[in-house]
Amino acid sequence: MKCCSYKIGTILDISDSFDGNYKFITIGNDPKDIYSQVRLVYSNETLIVDCEYNEISVYDLYVGNRIVAYHSNIMTMSIPPQTNALIIEVK
């Protein structure tokens, strides 16, 4: 049994939750194809690293960054699906 899955993509959007406790990071390979996108839920438990594996902040992420996101196997059935981000690696 795998503990998590991963998705490779480009950051298309970064937004805050209503209460400000979470950030939503939408990734995909085609901004016009909503069916290829995933919405990652960032929390204080999410680890973010740069290409040299140095820990960085969520504020160091930008639209257009290419990333590998390791995320929970549990996803909503919405479009795009949402899942908890465990590790985000900037390429």
Indicate where each model-derived feature is located.
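Beta-strand/loop nucleic-acid-binding surfaces
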Residues: 35-56
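Short, flexible, surface-exposed loop segments at domain boundaries
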Residues: 1-32, 51-91
